[in-house]
C-alpha cells in the first residue's frame, strides 16, 4: 500500500486542484514501482506522465533494484493448420490467474525454436510454406519486438539451447555436417556455423520433437520410423 500526504509549503501544496499529470515523474516512479504490474494498464490511464513512467526502461531498472520481481509464464500457442501460433501471458492479477493474448506481438511461424535470455525471448526459424531463417527478439518488459540477423540456414523444429550466453541451434534441416549446428553471439548479433558430425540415427529432415539443456549439454529428441513403428532417440551437443 502507498500512502500519500500533502507536503505543506511546496509549489503546489496550496493548490487543491493539482492534477496527477503535474506530479514529478520521480515521485510517480516511487509510487508505482512497488505496485504489481497487473495494475499498470489502469494506472497508465491517469495521465500522460503516468503512462510515460510506466512504459519507461527506468521503471524496470528501479523495480529490479528494489527486488520487485514477478514470475510470468509466456505461452506460444497455436493449432496448425487452423490458427497460426500467438503469444499469450499467464500471470497473477487482481483475479487468481489470467491467460491473455499479447496483441502487440505478431503471428509466429509454427515449429519455431524459442529460448530466453534475461527479459528477452528469441524466436528462430519455423515454417511458412517452407522452412525459414527468420529471427525475432521480444522485449518482455514492454512487449515490443524487432528482427535480428537471419540464421545462416532455414530451420524448422530445430533444437535450441543457451550456454555461456550464446544461442546454439541444432538440426531442423536436411542433415549434413557442414551446417547441422550454428551459434548466435548476442553481443555482436552474428551467426556462425559450428563444425560437428550429424547423428546417423537422425531423420533426413533433421526434425526434433523436444529438447533440454543440462550441465553444458544440449539434448535433442527426435522420432524415427522403422517398419511402421515409431520410437524415440536422442542426440546431444557438449559445449566445453
Curated annotation (Swiss-Prot):
CDD domains: F-box_AtAFR-like (cd22152). The keyword Repeat applies. InterPro entries: F-box/kelch-repeat_ARATH, F-box_dom, Kelch-typ_b-propeller, Kelch_1. Keywords: Kelch repeat, Repeat. Residues 1-20 are annotated as: Disordered. Residues 17-63 form the F-box domain. Kelch repeats lie at residues 120-165, 167-212. This is Putative F-box/kelch-repeat protein At2g29860. The lineage of its organism: Eukaryota, Viridiplantae, Streptophyta, Embryophyta, Tracheophyta.
